[in-house]
């Protein structure tokens, strides 16, 4: 999966980008991850057992840019995702941009769908780093790290909602943290 994530990153039309790969030292793919390191791809190794919120905080701490974006290794960010979101967040004068909907692929049911508008896929976030809150990194909430971040921005009315579902494909598979199949209330149309 990480090969596709790195390929999507390298294919982004936005020129000034950096990818932070965070993994624990027990990762069986550690040697493979090291092969991706270059001028704009950094690898950070952490102790085994860190929850995803902690891993994401580490990636934010290691990022050099003025803006940060979530980059999941199992999803596909199409080539203009960063450029379109960056342009929109600047034009909107907001602190964060989420896509209002996305393409969703259920790899178990072998179905591709267009999510309903307003679903807001959390992993499509692009945010101004200076005002970014910390991810939830408590072990008792290992898979809901994105929710408090999104609620923080919604409460502040600082969200730029971009309706361009063709920029992102959310993959559903048996290792997802939140759902293992498309939920009926998630979709508008099955493609």
Describe the function of each predicted region.
Residues 100, 160-167:
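Catalytic beta-strand/loop signature of glycosyltransferases that borders the donor
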Residues 68:
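Short aromatic/hydrophobic "clamp" motif used to bind/position activated sugar donors
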Residues 46-63:
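Glycine-rich, basic loop-to-helix element that forms the pyrophosphate-binding segment
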Residues 16-26, 42-46:
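Short beta-strand/loop segment that forms part of the nucleotide-sugar
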Residues 142-149:
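Acidic donor-binding loop at a coil-to-helix junction in glycosyltransferase catalytic cores
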Residues 7-16:
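Short, acidic, metal-binding catalytic loop of nucleotide-sugar glycosyltransferases
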Residues 82-111:
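Conserved donor NDP-sugar-binding/catalytic core segment of glycosyltransferases
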């Amino acid at each position: 999966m990480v090969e596709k994530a790195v390929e999507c990153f390298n294919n982004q039309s936005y020129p000034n980008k950096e990818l932070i790969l965070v993994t624990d030292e027990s990762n069986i793919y550690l040697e493979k991850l090291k092969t991706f390191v270059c001028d704009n791809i950094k690898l950070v190794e952490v102790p085994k057992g860190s929850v995803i919120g902690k891993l994401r905080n580490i990636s934010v701490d290691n990022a050099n840019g003025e803006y940060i974006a979530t980059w999941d290794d199992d999803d596909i960010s199409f080539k203009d995702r960063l450029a379109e979101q960056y342009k929109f967040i600047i034009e909107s004068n907001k602190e964060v941009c989420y896509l209002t909907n996305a393409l969703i692929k259920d790899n178990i049911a072998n179905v591709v769908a267009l999510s309903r508008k307003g679903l807001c896929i959390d992993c499509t976030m692009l945010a101004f780093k200076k005002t970014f809150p910390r991810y939830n990194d408590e072990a008792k909430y290992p898979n809901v790290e994105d929710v408090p971040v999104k609620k923080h921005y919604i409460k502040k009315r600082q969200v730029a909602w971009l309706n361009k579902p063709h920029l992102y494909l959310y993959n559903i598979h048996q290792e997802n943290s939140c759902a293992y199949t498309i939920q009926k209330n998630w979709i508008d149309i099955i493609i």
